[in-house]
């Protein structure tokens, strides 16, 4: 009963308007919230990349809808997980499932291959697509990944503060940032096709990182960010080389005509 009472008290504090008044007028509170938003933003770069790839197969308008609908689910998961607090540490299996799903996307892209009309990780003959349709099946997949990402984000947030109001405001702003970054990645992938392969390489690294954290091995954030920056730098160089090659081929073809 004490355990249940503790959880209910935590959720009840979300609606303590006096507390919110004190929080929103306290500069120290905003300092903590700002720190958490920055942390969430840095951690959300890889999450946003995964979400961008997951919705890439949809028409442009449906991509935005899928990310928007997934946004509501992400807020719900974040609200629930903040209430549960440190009990998240017991949900290691969510990270394992998320890592396995990401690993499958990488294997399918590089080794198994897929038909052009089949989505990245979302086959048209899969049971989810047959049951819910391609759009809603994609939304469900996004929600499942949000579930795994919520575990990572909340555990990281507890390192900044264990105060409910810091976790709630910082976490909600972090989710919004993740969706914004995901939309930017979608635009970049359309303009620089080589980024798609880079995305799957990084998704493989993310899968290893997520699986490792489930068994208490944490890749240093500095190492992970260096890998991301290096991957994007190499991709831009390859894109430039391919562009120059394409220009030379077009020039040669026009001369032959």
Curated annotation (Swiss-Prot):
Its main location: membrane. The keyword Hydrolase does not apply. Pfam families: TerC. InterPro entries: CHP03716_TM_YkoY, Integral_membrane_TerC. GO terms for cellular component: plasma membrane. Keywords: Cell membrane, Membrane, Transmembrane, Transmembrane helix. The chain crosses the membrane at residues 23-43, 79-99, 131-151, 158-178, 199-219, 221-241. Belongs to the TerC family. This is Uncharacterized membrane protein YceF. The gene is yceF.
């Amino acid at each position: 009963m004490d355990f249940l009472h503790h959880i209910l008290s935590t959720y009840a504090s979300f609606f303590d308007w006096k507390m919110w008044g004190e929080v929103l007028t306290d500069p120290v509170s905003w300092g903590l919230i700002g720190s958490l938003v920055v942390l969430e933003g840095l951690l959300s770069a890889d999450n946003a990349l995964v979400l961008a790839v997951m919705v890439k197969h949809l028409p442009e308008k449906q991509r935005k809808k899928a990310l928007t609908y997934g946004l509501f689910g992400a807020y719900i998961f974040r609200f629930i997980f903040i209430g549960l607090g440190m009990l998240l540490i017991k949900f290691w299996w969510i990270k394992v499932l998320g890592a396995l799903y990401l690993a499958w996307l990488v294997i399918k892209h590089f080794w198994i291959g897929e038909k052009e009309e089949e989505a990245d990780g979302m086959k048209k003959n899969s049971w989810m697509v047959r049951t819910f349709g391609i759009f809603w099946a994609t939304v469900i997949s996004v929600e499942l990944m949000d579930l795994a990402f919520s575990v990572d984000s909340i555990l990281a947030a507890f390192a900044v503060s264990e105060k409910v109001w810091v976790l709630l405001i910082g976490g909600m702003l972090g989710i919004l940032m993740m969706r914004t970054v995901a939309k930017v990645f979608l635009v970049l992938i359309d303009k620089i096709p080589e980024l798609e392969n880079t995305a799957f390489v990084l998704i493989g690294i993310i899968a290893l990182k997520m699986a490792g954290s489930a068994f208490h091995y944490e890749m240093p954030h500095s190492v992970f960010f260096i890998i991301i920056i290096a991957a994007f730098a190499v991709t831009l160089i390859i894109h430039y080389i391919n562009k120059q090659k394409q220009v030379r081929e077009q020039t040669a073809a026009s001369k032959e005509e």
